[in-house]
Regions:
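C-terminal functional module detector
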Residues: 1-19, 23-196
Length: 196
């Protein structure tokens, strides 16, 4: 066992970290390629503990500087049951944060985050609703279209209700998501709304 730990420390456990940092392996790259997925956040630190799991117990963790506290996934479930939560995840009615327990709502009319709307159903420029309850003042709430910021709101309060607009007509293949930044640096991302 000791030999395996030493090998992992000196050789690493594979190319996972480097591969994940390579160009083309990011969430935005997948969206640009047409993949449709919801945003979640979390970690896998092998100890099965939620929240901030780095605890020095009977096992020695020689290097912890590459470990970060896990994120938090929020879901908008119709039922507070196991099936209801998984239904919300499958429907992409979810968001991820860097760890702050924010509440994030994002919609385009009646279409919630993760949903799909046809371009023909939109009459003119799209108006999105954002409702955020932060754990610190909200410094920015950004509407991102096809990986580019197109509108922004903020104001410094811990709660924000905002209407964000796309000044151009949406077309099939477009996608929009919400990116929230608090004054303390914590962030959240709401799953995209996809235009078909």
């Amino acid at each position: 066992m000791r030999h395996a730990h030493k090998k992992a420390k000196t050789k690493g456990s594979g190319g996972y970290f480097k591969t994940g940092e390579a160009r083309g392996h990011h969430l935005q790259d997948g969206l640009a390629r047409g993949y449709r997925f919801g945003f979640t956040a979390g970690s896998e630190s092998h100890d099965g503990r939620p929240s901030r799991p780095i605890v020095h117990g009977p096992y020695v963790i020689a290097e912890t500087d590459f470990l970060a506290p896990p994120g938090v996934t929020g879901v908008w479930a119709e039922r507070f049951t196991r099936d209801g939560i998984f239904d919300a995840l499958r429907a992409r009615r979810c968001y991820g944060t860097t760890g702050a327990r924010m509440i994030v709502r994002f919609s385009l009319g009646e279409t919630p985050m993760g949903g799909e709307v046809t371009a023909s159903a939109l009459s003119g420029p799209a108006e999105f609703s954002a409702r955020i309850i932060g754990t610190a003042p909200i410094s920015a709430c950004e509407l991102v279209k096809n990986n580019r910021e197109i509108d922004r709101a903020g104001g410094g309060a811990t709660e924000l209700n905002a209407t964000l607009r796309d000044r151009e007509a949406a077309k099939p293949g477009d996608y929009y998501y919400l990116r929230v930044t608090q004054a303390d640096g914590e962030m959240a991302w709401a799953s995209p709304i996809f235009v078909t």
